[in-house]
Regions:
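Conserved HRD-motif arginine in the catalytic loop of eukaryotic-like protein kinases
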Residues: 117
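Conserved activation segment of eukaryotic-like protein kinases, specifically the C-terminal portion
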Residues: 1-14
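Hydrophobic anchor on a C-lobe helix of Hanks-type protein kinase catalytic domains
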Residues: 14, 37-38
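C-terminal intrinsically disordered, low-complexity extensions immediately downstream
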Residues: 130-196
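Conserved catalytic-loop aspartate of Hanks-type protein kinases
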Residues: 26
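Activation segment
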Residues: 2, 16-22, 44
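C-terminal lobe substrate-recognition/regulatory segment of protein kinase catalytic domains
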Residues: 60-108
Length: 197
C-alpha cells in the first residue's frame, strides 16, 4: 500500500508499514482533504515519510505509549518515542474562518491511533455533515463490492493486461454508442418518411 495514496494523505499506520488497508486509513485521507479544503493548502506536505511523520506529530501531537501498540516495528516505535513532545494544535485556531464543526470533524478524523479514529458511520452522523446526510435517503449497493476484477489468472494484472482490457471495454462501448446512434438515425429517417407521405 506504499503507493496506494499520495504521501501527504497517508495515515500514520501506512507510513509506519504496520497495517492492512482499512477504512480508518480512508478516514485519515479524507480528513487531510477536508483540512486542505478549509486551509487552501495541504496540511501535511511531507518531503519523505520521516518528514511526513514529523509534520503529523507537530499538528496532532505526539502519540502516547498506549497509542503505539499498533506499531509493529521496534525501530519505528523507538523513533516515535524519541520525538520531542508536541501537544495537539487547535484546529479552530488553525482555521479561524472555518465552521467550528468542520474543525471538530477534522480533529476526530486525524487521530494517530486508528482504533480511536472516528469511523464512517460516526462521520456521517457528525453535526457538520447533518445537512448532507439523510439515513432515509441512503443508497445501498445490491451486493458488497469486491476487487476480484484486479485478479487475472490467479495473480495481479500486468500493466499490459490492464491496457488490453481497457481497450476492449472502449471498443465495446464504442460499438454500443454507434449502435444506439444508428438506431436513433433509423428511427428519425422512418419518422421523416412518414411525414413526406
Amino acid at each position: 500500500t506504499e503507493y496506494v495514496v499520495t504521501r501527504w494523505y497517508r495515515a500514520p499506520e501506512l507510513l509506519l508499514s504496520c497495517a492492512e488497508y482499512s477504512v480508518a486509513i480512508d478516514i485519515w485521507s479524507s480528513g487531510c482533504i477536508l483540512a486542505e479544503l478549509l486551509g487552501r493548502k495541504p496540511l501535511f506536505p511531507g518531503k519523505d515519510y520521516v518528514h511526513q511523520l514529523n509534520l503529523i506529530t507537530k499538528v496532532i501531537g505526539t502519540p502516547d505509549e498506549q497509542d503505539l501498540y499498533f506499531v509493529t516495528s521496534d525501530k519505528a516505535r523507538r523513533y516515535l518515542r524519541q520525538l520531542p513532545y508536541s501537544k495537539p494544535m487547535d484546529f479552530k485556531r488553525l482555521y479561524p474562518e472555518a465552521n467550528p464543526l468542520a474543525c471538530d470533524l477534522i480533529e476526530k478524523m486525524l487521530i494517530f491511533n486508528p482504533e480511536k479514529r472516528i469511523n464512517v458511520e460516526e462521520c456521517l452522523k457528525h453535526p457538520y455533515l447533518a445537512s448532507l446526510h439523510d439515513v432515509n435517503d441512503e443508497p445501498v449497493a445490491d451486493a458488497p463490492f469486491t476487487f476480484a476484477f484486479e485478479q487475472h489468472n490467479g495473480g495481479e494484472m500486468s500493466e499490459e493486461t490492464v491496457r488490453r482490457l481497457i481497450l476492449q471495454e472502449l471498443k465495446q462501448l464504442d460499438e454500443e454508442i454507434n449502435f444506439n446512434a444508428r438506431s436513433h438515425a433509423d428511427a428519425l429517417e422512418e419518422r421523416l418518411q412518414t411525414m413526406r407521405v
